[in-house]
Amino acid sequence: MTNVNVDVTPLTTKPSQDGFYMPAEWAAQQAVWMIWPYRPDNWRAAGAYAQATFAKVVDAIGAATPVYMGVPKAFLAKAKTVMPSHVTLVEMDSNDCWARDTGPTVVVNAEGECRGVDWGFNAWGGHNGGLYFPWDKDEQVAQQMLAQHGFARYRAPLILEGGSIHVDGEGTCMTSAECLLNANRNPELTKEQIEGLLRDYLNVKQFIWLQDGVYMDETDGHIDNMCCFARPGEVILHWTDDESDPQYPRSKAALEVLQNTVDAQGRKLKIHLLPQPGPLYCSEEESKGVTEGTGVPRTAGERLAGSYVNFLITNHRIVFPLLDPATDDIAAQKLQEIFPEHEIVGVPAREILLGGGNIHCITQQIPAGK
C-alpha cells in the first residue's frame, strides 16, 4: 500500500506544443488504474457485490498488466481482504469509482516520456443532470494518480470524461455529440472550440462524431459504451438487428456515419458489429439494495445500458463483460475473430452494469512510455 498526497503543479504548455499525444489503447501499458466502489446510493449492499466483481476484473487484468487501485483510507483494511494480493493499493479519496472518467489521460512523446492530462470533471452534468453531488474528491483523482507515477500534469480547460473519447493513436478521435456537445458539459464552447481543445490536448487532427451513444446510458452517451477502435482503420460498433428496439436507430445512424467517413490517414473504416446483450433490466431485488442519497436512484424495471463494447484492451489481452448467457459466447467469439492475437477473457460484470457502467468505465490504462 502506498500513500499519495502530492500537488503536481500544472504545466503552462499544451501536449501538442510539446510533441505529446494520446496513444491507442492497444499500445503497450505499464499499469491499469481502478478505484474502490463503496457508494451505498449507487452500489447495492454498500458496494459488497461490486467489490467482489472488481476483484475478478483485477485478476483478469493482472495476468497481463500491473493494477493499481485507489482506496479511501476508511476502506483500506477491507480492500486488503477482498482484492488479490498482486494489486497495489493506494490511499486515495474519491466520490465514486469511475477511473476512466476521473483519472488522467496519459500522453506520450516519441522518446517515450509520459505526461498526464487532467480534465475538468462535473459528475456527468453537474447540477444539470449530473449523477451525484459533491464530486470534489473525484476532481483530485487524476492529480493523485499522476503523482504516484511522477508524471508532469497538464490541466485542460474542458469538462471531459475519459469514456467520452476514443483514439487510434494515428491522429483520429471518435466521440459522440450526445455527450461532448451536451449543454451540461461545456455550454460556453462551440463544437469547433471543443475540437480545438482536443487537438491541443490529445494531439489529434481528425474527428469522427457519432450522434448518440447507447440507449439509457446515464453518462449521456459515452463513446466507450457504443463504439471503439480495434486497430487503425477498424472500429467495433454496438449493434442490434431488432428494428423495434430503441437502440436500433442509434446504432443504424452511427453505422451510416462510420460508413461515410475516413480516419486521419484517409482510410475508409472496416466496421465490426458486436451484438447487444439482453435487453437487460434492473430487478426488484437489485434495486432494493441501493440506499437513497445524492446519487441517481436505481429503479426496478429500468433498462440497463449493457454493451460488450465496454471492454479493455491491455497488453494483448481483451477483458470484456459477461452480461447475458444468450449472447456472451457470441460476443467472445466475435472478439476473438477481431483480435486473433489477443487472449479473450470474460468477467461476470452485471454488478458493474447496475452501477451505471462497465469494465472500460472502471479502468484507466497508463501507457508504457520508456
From Swiss-Prot:
Keyword Transmembrane helix listed: no
UniProt GO MF annotations: agmatine deiminase activity; protein-arginine deiminase activity
Enzymatic reactions: agmatine + H2O = N-carbamoylputrescine + NH4(+)
UniProt EC number: 3.5.3.12
This protein's UniProt keywords: Hydrolase
GO biological process: one example: putrescine biosynthetic process
Catalytic residue positions: C361
SUPFAM superfamilies assigned to the protein according to its UniProt record, in alphabetical order: Pentein
This protein's record includes keyword Hydrolase: yes
Enzyme class name: hydrolase
Family per similarity comment: Belongs to the agmatine deiminase family.
NCBIfam families: agmatine_aguA (TIGR03380), PRK13551.1 (NF010070)
Protein name in the entry: Putative agmatine deiminase
Record lineage: Bacteria, Pseudomonadati, Pseudomonadota, Gammaproteobacteria, Alteromonadales
Annotated gene: aguA
